[in-house]
Amino acid sequence: MFQGLSPLARDARAWPFEQARVLLARILRLRLSDAERDLASVLIHSGKADEAVRTFPALAKPVILETGYGPSGLPHLGTFGEVARTTMVRNAFRALTDDAIKTRLIAFSDDMDGLRKVPDNIENKQPLIEDLGKPLTVVRDPFGTHDSFGAHNNARLRAFLDGFGFEYEFVSSTDCYKGGLFDETLLTALARFDAIQKVMLPTLGEERRASYSPFLPISPSTGKVLQVPTLERDVDKGTIVFQDEDGSKVEVPVTGGHVKMQWKPDWAMRWTALGVDYEMSGKDLIDSVKASGQICKALGGVPPEGFNYELFLDENSQKISKSKGNGLSMEDWLRYGAPESLSYYMFQSPKSAKKLYFDVIPKATDEYLQQLDAYPKQEPAKQLDNPVWHVHSGRPPQYGSPVSFSLMLNLVSAANASDKEILWGFLSRYIPGATPQSQPLLDRLAGYAINYYEDFVKPSKVFRAPDDKERAAMLDLLGRLKALPSDCQDAELIQNEVFAVGKDHGFDPLRAWFQALYEVLLGQSQGPRFGSFAAIFGLDRTTALIAEKLAV
C-alpha cells in the first residue's frame, strides 16, 4: 500500500511528511556511520529502501512511535487526536521508506500511577475512596467487570482505539515494571540519581525540593504509591531505603515493580527502555518534554523526535477543561459528525490553536467531503498532501457524498424530517438509483444531520417576515421558479434565476438577498447554495414553501 511512494513523499509538504523526514534523519543518524548514512540515503531516496535495509541490518530494527494514556479516566478527544496524528506520521514514514523499514506504534498506559482522586462521574465511589493512593491496576474496579480500575479503563482504551481501526500495540506500565522490562534502566537511574535530581530540583518549589525523589516506592504495608524522600541508596544491591507510612524504615529493590518513577523521570526512563523514536505532546508539556529529554540523556538514551501540538479552545477562546465541561466531548462529535470528519479536523494545522465547539462540525464535515471529492482528480503528488490520504491511511474511499452536510441540514429543516426515511424520499429522487446501501456515507450524514438539526438548529430557529423590497423579490422569484418545469433538478439553472432576481431588485451585496431567503424561508441566517437546496427539496415544494411564507 505504501510501496513506490518514496519519490513523491520526499517532496510532500503535508506536516506528517515533514515529521516523517525528521524521523528518518534520526534513524539514519543514530543507527549508521557517516559513510553508511550517505549510501542509505541515496538508496532510500531512489526508491530502494528495501536494499538499504538488506545492506544495513541496523535498519531492520523497528522504528517506535509512542502515545501515552492516563487510565484514571476514560479515553477522550485528546486521546483520539494524539493517536490519529501519530498514525498519520507513521503512515507518512512508511510511504517515505516504501514500507521497507518496519514501524511500531505503542499505546502506553500509565496504569501503575497511584489513584489521586475519585472521578466525579462514577456512582460506586466507595472502593475507589478506600483504595486512594494505590496503583490503578490494584484499585478495585467499581464496575465489577475487571480485575482492577486500571484494567477496566485499559479495556475501554483498547475498545476505543479498535473501534476507530487504529493499528497499535498496547503496553502496560504495570507489566513493564513488574515483568522486568524496565529493570536495567531503573538500575541505571539509581546509579545516576544525582544527575536526575540536578534536572528536577530546580523545577520544584522549596518545600517540594526537600522531599523529592525520582523513585516512588510501593508501600509493602499499605500497597500505596508513596511520595517520600529516598533516605539511602545502594547501587550495588539495586535498592533504596525509605520511611513507610507506619514510621518504619524499609529497603526495597528498584526493580521488579517495587517502585515506580515520578512522571517526568518515568517518561524519560520509558523512552530509554523502550527505545522510543517519536512522541508528540501538547503545548502544555513543553517544559516537561525538556526535563524528560535531559533525564533521558542522563540515562544514556536519546530523546525521541516529535512536536508540541496546540491545545483546543472553546468558542470563547478558553482552554478546554474536562472539569469545567466546556468544549466538545468525543461522544458529542460522534453524535453529529462522522469519525472521518474528526480525523480531518485533527489533521488541520496541529501547531495552531483551534476552537472546538459544536459549530465546527458541519464545517469540518463539508471540508472533508470537498477534499474527498477532489482526491481522485488530483495528480499523485498532490494526493499525498490531501488530508483524506492521511485520514484514511493512504486509502481514501472511492465515493464520497453527492450532497454536502450543510445542504442536508437545510433539507432536514425544510422537510421537518425526523427520520432518515423521510430524507431518503428526497435523496432518491434527486440522485437516481441512490439507496442507503449504495451511498453509505450519505446515509450516515443523514443521521448526523437529523441529530444536529434537532439539538442545535431547531431550538434556535427564528423566522421573520420579509420587508417590502424582499417580498417583491420573493414574489418575482416565485413566478420565475413556477415557469420552470416542475421536475427541474438543474441546480445551476435554479441558482441563476435566484441570482438574477437579487440583482434585478437591487440587492447589494447579493449576500443580503440570500440571507433574506434563508431567514424568511428556513428561520436561519445562512445555508448552502439555494439552487442546490431547491433542486434536492423539489421545485414544487420550494415554490409551495415560498408561497406559504408570503401568504399568497
Swiss-Prot record:
It is found in: Cytoplasm. One of its GO terms (biological process) is lysyl-tRNA aminoacylation. ATP binds at residue 322. GO terms for molecular function: ATP binding; lysine-tRNA ligase activity; tRNA binding. Pfam families: tRNA-synt_1f. A motif ('KMSKS' region) lies at residues 319-323. Keywords: Aminoacyl-tRNA synthetase, ATP-binding, Cytoplasm, Ligase, Nucleotide-binding, Protein biosynthesis. Its main location: cytoplasm. The keyword Glycoprotein does not apply. Its EC number is 6.1.1.6. InterPro entries: aa-tRNA-synth_I_codon-bd_sub2, aa-tRNA-synth_I_CS, aa_tRNA-synth_I_cd-bd_sf, Lys-tRNA-ligase, Rossmann-like_a/b/a_fold. GO terms for cellular component: cytoplasm. Belongs to the class-I aminoacyl-tRNA synthetase family. This is Lysine--tRNA ligase. It comes from Caulobacter sp. (strain K31).
